Design a protein with these regions (language model features):
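An acidic/histidine-cluster motif and surrounding catalytic segment
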Residues: 1-76, 80-212
Length: 212
């Protein structure tokens, strides 16, 4: 495996057609880790409720992954940024630590809310953690995800929001992992989901506090 990102069968980045600025940013980030030519741009599904658009976009990718019989698929959001000096080394060591673990979700970064559980030196067992800016789905979770969201037209309750569902349901029932140290966060910029400028510095601070 020349590049640790070869661990992932396919890599997608969700990007709204009108956010050319975000796509240019994302390509620069992908170029840093040698995957610019591998990342497939997924035209984000636009909804008045951006949270619903994120769900439908992820659902579209997961359905593609199942159709293509991919063992796993890595999904980025277009505001992702690599926050460590050696992301390829971090990812490589974390993947080595996975070994034969039957994981379902594998995060490169997350908004953590609890003290983090290190199951190996470079691997965290993730619980009660949010955000979906850089996350891989394993094939064992495709059907669970599709069953939850297929045909969704609106969000009826808070627990239907994508990262809330993953944190409260999937992370509680399945093996969900994150690299250690966390290697991605999100840039501070205008969010089409939140409809305002968002500062994501708190994600990095929470990780520092929760990994102690």
């Amino acid at each position: 495996m020349k590049n640790p990102f070869d661990f992932f069968d396919e890599i997608y980045c969700i990007n709204l057609d009108n956010r050319i600025d975000r796509w240019k940013h994302a390509q620069k980030e992908f170029d840093k880790v040698g995957i610019k030519d591998r990342v497939i741009r997924f035209s984000a599904i636009k909804e008045d409720d951006g949270r619903l658009g994120i769900i439908k976009s992820n659902l579209g990718i997961v359905k593609l992954a199942k159709k293509k019989k991919l063992k796993n698929v890595l999904v980025f959001e277009d505001d992702v940024e690599f926050i460590v000096d050696n992301p390829l080394e971090v990812l490589s060591k974390s993947i080595d630590d996975i070994g034969n673990l039957n994981w379902s979700l594998f995060y490169l970064g997350a908004n953590t809310h609890n003290k983090l559980i290190k199951i190996k030196k470079h691997l965290i067992l993730l619980k009660n953690s949010f955000a979906v800016h850089s996350m891989a789905y394993n094939e064992n979770i495709y059907d669970v995800f599709i069953q939850k969201y297929d045909g969704v037209k609106m969000l009826y309750k808070h627990s239907d929001i994508l990262d809330v569902f993953l944190a409260q349901e999937i992370q509680e029932k399945y093996i969900c992992l994150m690299v250690n140290p966390m290697m991605t966060s999100q840039i501070n910029s205008y969010s089409d989901i939140e409809k305002c400028e968002v500062n994501y510095d708190f994600i990095k601070e929470r990780f520092k506090n929760n990994i102690k």
